[in-house]
Amino acid sequence: MTRSRRWIVAAIAVGFAVRVAFALGYWVEQPLTHDEREYLALARSIARGDGVVYPADEPVTGTAQRFGRAPGYPVFLAMLHVTQPVDTVPARVKIAQSAVGAIGVWLIALIGGRAAGPRGAVAAAGIAAVYPPLVFMPAYALSETLYCTVALAAAWVLGTVTLTLSERPGSVTVTVPNRKSVTVTVLGAGLTGIGILVRPAMLFFVPFAAAWMVWKRETRHAVIFVLVTLASVAPWTVRNARVHGRFVLVASEGGVTFWTGNNPLARGEGDMAANPELKRAELEFRNRHADLTPEQREPLYYREAFAWIRRHPAQWTALLARKVFYTIVPLGPSYTLHSKKYLVASAGAYLLLLPPALAGAWRLRRGCAPVALWLLAASTVFVSVVFFPQERFRIPVIDPALIVSAAALAAARSHEHTGCRSNL
């Protein structure tokens, strides 16, 4: 085992240890959020063999609606034998997610190594192992940790698809055989489909990746990628049509999310928890359509949001500008809901990472840029602007992309000794 690999293994071990230490030693006996309760409730139904439905014995708390959710994360929780009602996140869930997070550290190292060589891999693994937002997330029964690792796996696999490479002085050009590239594309599409079933926001990665393939004159791979991804999601879409009586591609929460981010009361960042006025407006909206189910109300949310956009294009444009700002700068209204300690650890870590990440990205732009990961990050930014930015949306994809970019500064030279594989 080379020295760099030993360092990466050590970083993975440290990453697992600090995640478990935070989850079991600090974040203990914490009450569940609404999303955590819903995920755990769905997991109980799946574990009991009742399917992805809310159990009858699960109490309704607060005023939030129960939408049909993507099945990936509840299935993951069900595999951990979550069968009884709980008031806090079970320890086995925290430990399992810490292991998943450690795999994410490894994937970040792999992507960093491809982009910037062994030193870049070690630097990426070291940063990812102790980066506070990634350390915190396994302590919650939320989909971010699982989604992060699945999305990184898709970006890593798709990053090996190489059909045409440009020669550069001093570089080693590696070409993946055409048949193998098709197989890799299919595997990457399958992982993308799994990612969508964990977190539907990954749907927006599909057109970004396909457009890149077409631009690189690999239309056949783009078609294969799109078709296999949609085929991976299709069985769940068919199930939704049977259960809800209407087309629901993955989850039925898109309408209220779009309405939340495109509303005259929207502030440009954060959900309704950070905006009481918007929450009251949403309750009034539901009262006007009290005879409908959440799934039946979904298109009505879209309709009202688009109507406001058409009537007030200037106000909506200003709102988009605020969304772009808050996507980059962690100063939105939702951050005030956290303690100062959390704000310093989370937003502070992100702000420290941002400058070297921008410098590293500039260095990588003409070398072995992690294009697949960057496209995934770009699609996440797009989602934040279309809907609304929030820290939980940023952490799984944008922060790992920044870590890989920052790690490029640790490379002595631009990947001259290890060769380079272009992405997608």
Q: At which residue positions do the language-model features occur?
A:
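Transmembrane-helix signature of polytopic, membrane-embedded enzymes
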Residues: 10, 108-130, 148-149, 368-371
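Short helix- or helix-capping micro-motifs
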Residues: 15-18, 124-132, 136, 156, ...
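Short hydrophobic/aromatic helix or loop-helix immediately within or flanking a transmembrane segment
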Residues: 41-46, 60-86, 99, 145, ...
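Loop-to-helix entry region of an early transmembrane alpha helix in multi-pass inner-membrane enzymes
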Residues: 71-78, 83-103, 137, 141, ...
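Membrane-interface anchor segments at the N-terminal boundary of transmembrane helices
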Residues: 88, 92, 99, 300-301, ...
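Transmembrane-helix motifs of polytopic, lipid-linked glycan transferases
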Residues: 92-116, 153, 355-359
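Membrane-interface alpha helices of multi-pass inner-membrane proteins
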Residues: 124-125, 157, 184-199, 209-213, ...
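Membrane-proximal stem/loop segments at transmembrane-domain junctions that anchor or position
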Residues: 241, 249-322
